[in-house]
Protein backbone atom coordinates (compact mmCIF):
# COMPACT_ATOMS: atom_id res chain seq x y z
CA UNK A 1 0.00 0.00 0.00
CA UNK A 2 1.47 3.38 -1.05
CA UNK A 3 0.94 5.66 1.95
CA UNK A 4 1.32 8.87 -0.07
CA UNK A 5 -1.32 7.86 -2.62
CA UNK A 6 -3.81 6.76 0.02
CA UNK A 7 -3.19 9.32 2.74
CA UNK A 8 -5.52 12.28 3.11
CA UNK A 9 -3.68 15.40 4.25
CA UNK A 10 -5.91 17.75 6.21
CA UNK A 11 -5.11 21.28 7.36
CA UNK A 12 -7.22 22.06 10.43
CA UNK A 13 -7.49 25.70 11.54
CA UNK A 14 -8.87 26.33 15.01
CA UNK A 15 -7.74 28.92 17.55
CA UNK A 16 -8.24 26.45 20.41
CA UNK A 17 -5.22 24.07 20.33
CA UNK A 18 -6.76 21.59 22.79
CA UNK A 19 -9.89 21.27 20.67
CA UNK A 20 -7.79 20.94 17.51
CA UNK A 21 -5.88 18.08 19.12
CA UNK A 22 -9.14 16.40 20.13
CA UNK A 23 -10.46 16.70 16.56
CA UNK A 24 -7.26 15.15 15.20
CA UNK A 25 -7.52 12.20 17.60
CA UNK A 26 -11.16 11.49 16.74
CA UNK A 27 -10.65 11.88 13.00
CA UNK A 28 -7.66 9.54 12.99
CA UNK A 29 -9.74 6.98 14.87
CA UNK A 30 -12.31 7.18 12.08
CA UNK A 31 -9.79 6.85 9.25
CA UNK A 32 -6.12 5.99 9.67
CA UNK A 33 -5.35 7.54 6.27
CA UNK A 34 -5.93 10.99 7.75
CA UNK A 35 -2.79 13.06 8.33
CA UNK A 36 -3.87 16.16 10.22
CA UNK A 37 -1.84 19.30 10.72
CA UNK A 38 -3.33 21.92 13.02
CA UNK A 39 -2.81 25.67 12.93
CA UNK A 40 -4.25 28.28 15.28
CA UNK A 41 -4.92 31.09 12.81
CA UNK A 42 -5.90 31.73 9.22
CA UNK A 43 -2.59 33.47 8.48
CA UNK A 44 -0.69 30.43 9.77
CA UNK A 45 -2.95 28.26 7.62
CA UNK A 46 -2.17 30.27 4.48
CA UNK A 47 1.55 29.96 5.23
CA UNK A 48 1.25 26.17 5.56
CA UNK A 49 -0.78 25.94 2.35
CA UNK A 50 1.97 27.75 0.47
CA UNK A 51 4.57 25.28 1.82
CA UNK A 52 2.75 21.93 1.72
CA UNK A 53 0.10 20.23 -0.40
CA UNK A 54 -3.12 19.39 1.44
CA UNK A 55 -6.17 17.46 0.28
CA UNK A 56 -8.68 19.37 2.41
CA UNK A 57 -8.99 22.32 4.78
CA UNK A 58 -11.20 22.15 7.87
CA UNK A 59 -11.64 25.49 9.61
CA UNK A 60 -13.42 27.02 12.56
CA UNK A 61 -15.35 30.21 11.87
CA UNK A 62 -14.73 32.26 15.01
CA UNK A 63 -10.97 32.93 15.06
CA UNK A 64 -9.10 36.09 16.07
CA UNK A 65 -7.89 38.54 13.41
CA UNK A 66 -9.43 36.62 10.49
CA UNK A 67 -12.69 34.64 10.46
CA UNK A 68 -13.17 31.27 8.85
CA UNK A 69 -15.05 32.98 6.00
CA UNK A 70 -12.13 35.37 5.40
CA UNK A 71 -9.78 32.39 5.49
CA UNK A 72 -12.02 30.59 2.98
CA UNK A 73 -11.98 33.62 0.66
CA UNK A 74 -8.17 33.78 0.80
CA UNK A 75 -7.91 30.04 0.12
CA UNK A 76 -10.33 30.30 -2.83
CA UNK A 77 -8.17 33.07 -4.39
CA UNK A 78 -5.07 30.87 -4.36
CA UNK A 79 -6.46 27.33 -4.42
CA UNK A 80 -9.91 27.50 -6.03
CA UNK A 81 -10.45 23.72 -6.16
CA UNK A 82 -9.16 22.78 -2.69
CA UNK A 83 -11.99 21.32 -0.59
CA UNK A 84 -12.80 23.57 2.37
CA UNK A 85 -15.10 22.50 5.21
CA UNK A 86 -16.28 25.07 7.72
CA UNK A 87 -16.59 23.24 11.06
CA UNK A 88 -17.91 25.73 13.56
CA UNK A 89 -19.65 26.05 16.88
CA UNK A 90 -20.84 29.58 16.14
CA UNK A 91 -23.04 28.64 13.24
CA UNK A 92 -26.08 30.52 12.07
CA UNK A 93 -28.05 30.88 8.87
CA UNK A 94 -26.08 34.05 8.13
CA UNK A 95 -22.72 32.29 8.58
CA UNK A 96 -23.89 29.38 6.43
CA UNK A 97 -25.12 31.77 3.73
CA UNK A 98 -21.84 33.71 3.77
CA UNK A 99 -19.88 30.46 3.59
CA UNK A 100 -21.88 29.22 0.61
CA UNK A 101 -21.44 32.58 -1.15
CA UNK A 102 -17.67 32.38 -0.55
CA UNK A 103 -17.51 28.90 -2.08
CA UNK A 104 -17.34 26.58 0.91
CA UNK A 105 -17.33 22.89 -0.02
CA UNK A 106 -19.24 21.83 3.07
CA UNK A 107 -20.51 23.27 6.34
CA UNK A 108 -20.86 21.42 9.62
CA UNK A 109 -21.75 22.66 13.08
CA UNK A 110 -19.78 21.40 16.06
CA UNK A 111 -21.84 19.43 18.52
CA UNK A 112 -21.37 18.11 22.01
CA UNK A 113 -21.12 14.41 21.19
CA UNK A 114 -18.65 12.30 19.27
CA UNK A 115 -21.03 11.54 16.38
CA UNK A 116 -19.99 14.82 14.76
CA UNK A 117 -16.52 13.37 14.10
CA UNK A 118 -17.99 10.44 12.19
CA UNK A 119 -19.93 12.91 10.04
CA UNK A 120 -16.88 15.17 9.59
CA UNK A 121 -14.66 12.21 8.65
CA UNK A 122 -17.25 11.05 6.11
CA UNK A 123 -17.48 14.49 4.55
CA UNK A 124 -13.69 14.78 4.33
CA UNK A 125 -13.54 11.37 2.63
CA UNK A 126 -16.27 12.36 0.18
CA UNK A 127 -14.83 15.74 -0.83
CA UNK A 128 -11.29 14.42 -1.22
CA UNK A 129 -12.46 11.41 -3.23
CA UNK A 130 -14.48 13.70 -5.51
CA UNK A 131 -11.54 16.07 -6.01
CA UNK A 132 -9.17 13.20 -6.81
CA UNK A 133 -11.64 11.76 -9.31
CA UNK A 134 -12.01 15.17 -10.98
CA UNK A 135 -8.23 15.58 -11.18
CA UNK A 136 -7.87 12.10 -12.69
CA UNK A 137 -10.61 12.84 -15.26
CA UNK A 138 -8.82 16.07 -16.24
CA UNK A 139 -5.54 14.19 -16.68
CA UNK A 140 -7.23 11.56 -18.85
CA UNK A 141 -8.90 14.26 -20.94
CA UNK A 142 -5.58 16.05 -21.42
CA UNK A 143 -3.86 12.81 -22.49
CA UNK A 144 -6.70 11.96 -24.86
CA UNK A 145 -6.53 15.41 -26.45
CA UNK A 146 -2.77 15.08 -26.86
CA UNK A 147 -3.14 11.66 -28.48
CA UNK A 148 -5.83 12.80 -30.91
CA UNK A 149 -3.96 16.02 -31.77
CA UNK A 150 -0.78 14.11 -32.61
CA UNK A 151 -2.40 11.15 -34.36
CA UNK A 152 -2.15 10.72 -38.10
CA UNK A 153 -5.10 8.36 -38.01
CA UNK A 154 -8.67 9.43 -38.57
CA UNK A 155 -10.74 9.38 -35.43
CA UNK A 156 -14.48 9.12 -35.86
CA UNK A 157 -16.83 10.12 -33.07
CA UNK A 158 -20.36 8.74 -33.19
CA UNK A 159 -23.27 10.42 -31.47
CA UNK A 160 -26.17 7.97 -31.17
CA UNK A 161 -28.64 10.79 -30.53
CA UNK A 162 -27.84 12.65 -33.74
What do the predicted segments below correspond to?
Residues 14, 60-61, 88:
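Active-site residues of response regulator receiver
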Residues 7-27, 38, 57:
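Conserved acidic segment of CheY-like receiver
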Residues 3-6, 21-25, 98, 137-162:
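PAS/LOV and related PAS-like sensory modules
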Residues 38-47, 68:
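Helix N-cap/capping motif at the beta->alpha junctions
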Residues 52-58:
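Active-site beta3 strand of CheY-like receiver
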Residues 117-132:
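Receiver (REC) domain switch/output surface
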Residues 51, 63:
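Receiver (REC) domain active-site loop signature in two-component systems and cognate sites
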Amino acid sequence: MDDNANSIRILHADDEPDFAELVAVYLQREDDRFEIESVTSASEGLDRLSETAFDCVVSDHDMPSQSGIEFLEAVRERYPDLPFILFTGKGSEEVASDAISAGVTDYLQKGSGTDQYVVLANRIQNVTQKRRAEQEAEQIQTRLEAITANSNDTILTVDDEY
